């Protein structure tokens, strides 16, 4: 019974760390894009974070950051008239090329293609 209690406690603390991680990503995704940044804020190693996320059957910590940046990029593309360069600046990319590469890798199409296909649906 004691072993089961320890496992339950570990899981609860894991979920708490995951919750804190998601909150930190929401707050800092524009300026911090590395798991190491968040690991430092949580006083954990990136490997420990990865293990916790894996145990909880969640996407990797890096994937969480990428999905948050992707969601904000898509929101800005759909609901603002900002250029890809302006969006790259807002999201903290060094330049438009870095943003464009990131967006194409994660969504399978360029930012301009995404905006155009979505506008065609409205």
Regions found by a protein language model. Give the residues of each.
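Short hydrophobic/aromatic patch on the recognition helix
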Residues: 49-50, 98-99, 103
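Terminal helix-turn-helix DNA-binding modules in bacterial transcription factors
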Residues: 55-96, 113-122
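Core residues of bacterial helix-turn-helix
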Residues: 42, 91-92, 103
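Helix-turn-helix DNA-binding elements, focusing on the entry/boundary residues of the two helices
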Residues: 35, 46, 84, 100
């Amino acid at each position: 019974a004691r072993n089961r209690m320890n496992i339950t406690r570990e899981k609860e603390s894991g979920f708490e760390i995951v919750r804190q991680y998601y909150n930190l990503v929401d707050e800092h995704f524009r300026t911090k894009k590395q798991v190491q940044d968040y690991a430092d804020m949580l006083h954990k190693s990136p490997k420990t974070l990865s293990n916790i996320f894996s145990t909880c059957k969640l996407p990797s910590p890096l994937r969480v950051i990428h999905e948050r940046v992707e969601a904000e990029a898509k929101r800005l593309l759909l609901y603002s008239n900002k250029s890809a360069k302006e969006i790259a600046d807002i999201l903290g990319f060094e330049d438009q090329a870095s943003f464009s590469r990131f967006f194409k890798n994660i969504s399978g199409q360029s930012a301009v293609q995404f905006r155009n296909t979505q506008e065609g649906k409205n």
